[in-house]
C-alpha cells in the first residue's frame, strides 16, 4: 500500500482511498484503454496476471475495510495499482544448498538429478529463496536445467497464532525455477537467508526435505524451519528455544538415538552439537569444534548439513580469518557419537581465488550444503555474495587430507 505523508493536503482520506476514488471515477473508454495498455505490457512477462490483479483488489478491499466495490476491468485495474514487479535476483544468486531430486526418472546411468536452493537478493538488499534443478554425472559435466523466465506467486495460508506454521502452496509453478519463497511475515521483513536444506529421514521411514534459514526482522535475527515433501507445498515454522535467535543451524539427515540432531553456532564463534526430541525447539548443546587454524581464528561454522559416510559424519565448514576472508574446510564426526571429532582439515579446501575476490562482499566463498554420490562429492558454493560456482572432489582424497 502506498504510504501517507504527514504533509498531505487532503485530510480525512488515506492515500490508498484517494487512488481508488480516482480509478472509480475513470470514464469507461479511458478505463478500457489504460487496462488494455497494461495487459499488453505485462502478459508476456507474467502468467495469470489478471488473477493476480483480482487477488490484489480483494486485498485492497480488505485493508480499506470494504469501503468501495468494483467489478471487471475496473476491479483489476485497482488491483494493478496496488501491485508492483520485483526483480528478486537482480543483485545476487548465491549460498546454495543441494539435495537429491525426489524424481530420478529419465536420468542417464550413473547420473543424479539434484535440486539447488539459492539465496536471491533483489532491490533493497532483500533476500528470498529460489530454486534450480540440474543433473550431475561424476567425472562429467554438471548440467543445469534452463530456468523459466517467469516466477509464480504462492498461495499463502497464514496461521492463527504466531507459533503455528505458515503454509505456502506453489501449485501455479510449472517448473521449480518459478518457485520463489519471499519474506511474507513481519519477523521476516529484512529477508530470509541461507537455507540449509537436507533430506531428513523421519521416524516412520518417510522423507521430509527440511532446512533452517535465517529470518531477518526489525528486532534482530531468528532461525526458522522450511519443510516440504514435494517442493509444491511448503511450511515455514519458527524455531523456539534458547538458541533460536542465532544463525547457521544445520540439521542432521536422520535421528540420532531417537532425537533430532543439529549443528549450530549460537556463540558466533564455535560449532555446537544440539539434540532435541522436538524438531521445532532447541536448547543447550555441546561445543565440539573451535577455531584452531589461522584461517578460522575469527569464527567457525558449518557449510550445510552433515553427510553420513562409512567413516563418520562429514561436515563442510567455513572459517573466517584475517581481512574477514571466508574459506571452506571440513571435519569428520563419529557416526554414533557425533560430539567426538575424528579429524579436520588443517588447510582450507577452498579459499577465494584472485578471480573470486571481487563482488558484492569481497573475499568470500561459502556453501550451505554438498552432495555425495559414491566416492564423489559435488560442492556448490557462493562467491563474494554474488554468484554460485561448483567444485567436485573425491571423498577418499578429502579424508586423506584431514589430520
Language-model features: locations:
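Beta-rich carbohydrate-recognition and catalytic domains
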Residues: 1-192, 198-249, 254-298, 308-360, ...
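Donor nucleotide-activated moiety binding/catalytic core segment of transferases
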Residues: 295-303, 363-366
Amino acid at each position: 500500500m502506498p504510504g501517507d505523508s504527514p504533509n498531505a493536503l487532503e485530510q480525512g482520506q488515506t492515500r490508498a482511498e484517494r487512488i481508488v476514488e480516482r480509478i472509480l471515477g475513470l470514464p469507461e473508454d479511458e478505463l478500457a484503454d489504460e487496462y488494455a495498455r497494461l495487459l499488453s505490457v505485462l502478459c508476456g512477462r507474467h502468467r495469470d496476471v489478471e488473477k493476480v490483479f483480482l487477488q490484489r483488489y480483494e486485498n485492497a478491499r480488505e485493508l480499506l475495510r470494504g469501503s468501495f466495490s468494483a467489478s471487471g476491468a475496473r476491479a483489476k485495474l485497482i488491483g494493478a495499482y496496488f501491485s508492483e514487479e520485483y526483480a528478486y535476483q537482480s543483485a545476487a544468486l548465491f549460498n546454495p544448498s543441494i539435495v537429491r531430486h525426489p524424481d530420478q526418472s529419465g536420468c542417464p546411468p550413473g547420473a543424479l538429478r539434484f535440486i539447488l536452493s539459492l539465496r536471491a537478493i533483489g532491490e533493497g538488499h532483500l533476500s528470498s529463496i529460489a530454486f534450480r534443478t540440474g543433473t550431475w554425472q561424476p567425472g562429467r559435466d554438471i548440467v543445469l536445467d534452463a530456468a523459466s523466465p517467469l516466477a509464480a506467486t504462492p498461495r499463502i495460508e497464514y496461521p492463527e497464532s504466531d507459533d503455528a506454521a505458515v503454509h505456502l502452496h506453489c501449485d501455479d509453478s510449472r517448473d521449480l525455477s518459478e518457485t520463489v519463497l519471499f519474506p511474507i511475515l513481519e519477523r521476516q521483513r529484512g529477508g530470509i537467508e541461507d537455507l540449509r536444506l537436507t533430506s531428513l529421514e523421519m521416524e516412520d521411514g518417510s522423507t521430509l526435505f527440511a532446512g533452517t534459514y535465517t529470518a531477518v526482522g526489525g528486532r534482530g535475527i531468528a532461525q526458522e524451519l522450511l519443510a516440504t515433501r514435494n517442493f509444491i507445498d511448503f511450511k515455514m515454522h519458527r524455531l523456539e528455544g534458547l538458541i533460536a535467535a542465532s544463525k547457521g543451524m544445520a540439521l542432521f539427515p536422520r535421528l540420532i538415538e531417537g532425537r533430532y540432531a543439529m549443528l549450530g553456532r549460537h556463540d558466533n564463534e564455535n560449532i555446537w552439537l544440539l539434540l532435541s526430541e522436538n524438531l521445532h525447539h532447541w536448547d543447550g548443546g555441546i561445543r565440539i569444534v573451535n577455531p584452531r587454524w589461522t584461517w578460522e581464528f575469527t569464527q567457525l561454522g558449518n557449510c550445510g548439513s552433515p553427510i553420513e559416510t562409512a567413516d563418520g559424519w562429514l561436515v563442510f565448514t567455513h572459517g573466517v580469518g584475517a581481512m574477514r576472508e571466508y574459506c571452506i574446510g571440513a571435519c569428520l564426526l563419529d557416526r554414533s557419537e557425533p560430539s567426538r571429532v575424528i579429524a579436520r582439515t588443517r588447510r582450507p579446501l577452498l579459499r577465494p581465488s584472485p578471480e573470486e575476490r571481487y563482488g558484492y562482499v569481497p573475499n568470500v566463498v561459502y556453501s550451505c550444503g554438498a552432495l555425495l554420490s559414491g566416492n564423489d562429492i559435488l560442492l556448490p558454493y557462493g562467491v563474494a555474495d554474488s554468484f554460485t560456482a561448483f567444485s567436485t572432489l573425491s571423498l577418499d582424497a578429502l579424508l586423506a587430507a584431514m589430520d
